[in-house]
């Protein structure tokens, strides 16, 4: 998404996606892509892109397509990667990730 590439360096995104080829780990992706260094406002903008249906949450289907938000050619996360990602970010147990949970995940890396 052009919104994401206006916030993150495209070269960092490419590097982060290459690291995900063998397996997705959100902490490694957040660090390599530069997400972990972004301000709350920038993270909120990226969250809005990831929240495809604009529900205010990133749900399981949106988590599966997480990498595709950064590059159309990226792969879909498998079920295990998706459930691990959800478990890491869903601090209140509602089976979705809110904007504050997303910001916390980014800053924990």
Swiss-Prot record:
The superkingdom listed in its UniProt entry is Eukaryota
Q: Which residues form the signal peptide?
A: none
Temperature dependence of the activity comes to: Thermostable between pH 4.0-9.5. Average melting temperature (Tm) across all pH values is 68 degrees Celsius.
Which Pfam family, an example, fits this chain?
A: EF-hand_7
Q: Per UniProt, where does Ca(2+) 2 bind?
A: 90, 92, 94, 96, 101
UniProt keywords (A-Z) are: Acetylation, Allergen, Calcium, Metal-binding, Muscle protein, Repeat
Tell me a GO cellular component.
cytoplasm
Keyword field contains Membrane: no
The positions annotated for binding Ca(2+) 1 are: 51, 53, 55, 57, 59, 62
Q: Which residues carry this modification: N-acetylserine?
A: 1
Q: Does the keyword Acetylation apply?
A: yes
Q: Which residues form the EF-hand domain?
A: 38-73, 77-109
Which Gene3D superfamilies does the annotation name? EF-hand
GO MF, any single term: calcium ion binding
Q: Any extra detail in the entry?
A: This parvalbumin has an isoelectric point of 4.45.
Q: How does it assemble?
A: Monomer.
Task: Describe the function of this protein.
Answer: In muscle, parvalbumin is thought to be involved in relaxation after contraction. It binds two calcium ions.
Spell out the family assignment given in the record's similarity comment: Belongs to the parvalbumin family.
Name-wise, this protein is: Parvalbumin alpha
Organism (species) = Raja clavata
* Lineage start: Eukaryota, Metazoa, Chordata, Craniata, Vertebrata
């Amino acid at each position: 998404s052009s919104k994401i590439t206006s916030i993150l360096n495209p070269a960092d995104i490419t590097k982060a996606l290459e690291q995900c080829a063998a397996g997705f780990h959100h902490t490694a992706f957040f660090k390599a892509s530069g997400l972990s260094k972004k301000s709350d406002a920038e993270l909120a903008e990226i969250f809005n892109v990831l929240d495809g249906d604009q529900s205010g949450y990133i749900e399981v289907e949106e988590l599966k397509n997480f990498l595709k938000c950064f590059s159309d050619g990226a792969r879909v996360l498998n079920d295990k990667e998706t459930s691990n990602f959800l478990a890491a970010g869903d601090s209140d147990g509602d089976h979705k990730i809110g904007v504050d949970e997303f910001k916390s995940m980014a800053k924990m890396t």
